[in-house]
């Protein structure tokens, strides 16, 4: 068999061998693509089965419906500073739930009774505690001794309100302490007042002609520097500190930009730039760090890959004022560049 294959190889021409090699590569690629599609389909089926299983859980084990009054009363029991205010048998019955006002009155009266029983116990420590206090034993007796230092206020309908007011005042004091110590940091808010400008008419026409274009935002204004029009640089720098707003990227685009921070070969986000002559250019948006001699750096967005063509076509030069808008067309990031009147007139000549 080996000799037969060797004889066949001898008769094959060089072009035939190349064709056979390319065919093998194509077959391998097709097999890999088929396996990837099968794996993706299998994962999708598994995820759908898991989701369906989660839905069936609550069908087999329905959640128990509870009255809002019961939940509210249980929460009050947890935050109560007195362990003997409410008896364990004081939970509302069906009739009490139907008439919550009567039940609340009974609850308030039980609070007064419990408070009076505590006072009597403190005045006569040798006497036996009431039945409700006996449930808690020695711990309740110890707590009653400490409670004499701060007796309940009879002006309130129930000592539970004291607990709620104490928690509220405690939180308020904590907030005031953080403010005095400078622990509260204010978030950086984009100056949206500067962006309250009507969309230019030429941009409205461009978006209308492009179809499905929407969400125009004024994001950047700049007087061009020498580096912005230098052909060797081939970029427009947009420092973060000079951005009017920084919400023009989607979550996926932001992830791509952030992952490029530590990469030497940055991928960037592809975009379209439209000038006032309605001419479209393909550009790339990347994030760079501008390092200084002091060791500290500043971040900026940069429009590259085609910026030199835009500078040449629009005759941009140092000192020209430009305004940059962003919008979306079929989900694609787009920019619109508006020039100052003088540079635009020179460009149209």
UniProtKB/Swiss-Prot annotation:
Organism in which the protein naturally occurs:
Arabidopsis thaliana (Mouse-ear cress)
Can you tell which superkingdom this protein's organism belongs to?
A: Eukaryota
SUPFAM superfamilies of this UniProt entry?
DNA-binding pseudobarrel domain
> What is the name of the protein in this document?
B3 domain-containing protein At5g24050
**PANTHER family in the record:** B3 DOMAIN PLANT PROTEIN-RELATED (PTHR31541), TF-B3 DOMAIN-CONTAINING PROTEIN (PTHR31541:SF34)
Do you know which InterPro entries this protein is assigned to? Answer: At2g31720-like (IPR005508), B3_DNA-bd (IPR003340), DNA-bd_pseudobarrel_sf (IPR015300)
Q: Which GO terms describe its cellular component?
A: nucleus
DNA-binding region of this protein: 240-341
Q: Which GO terms describe its molecular function?
A: DNA binding
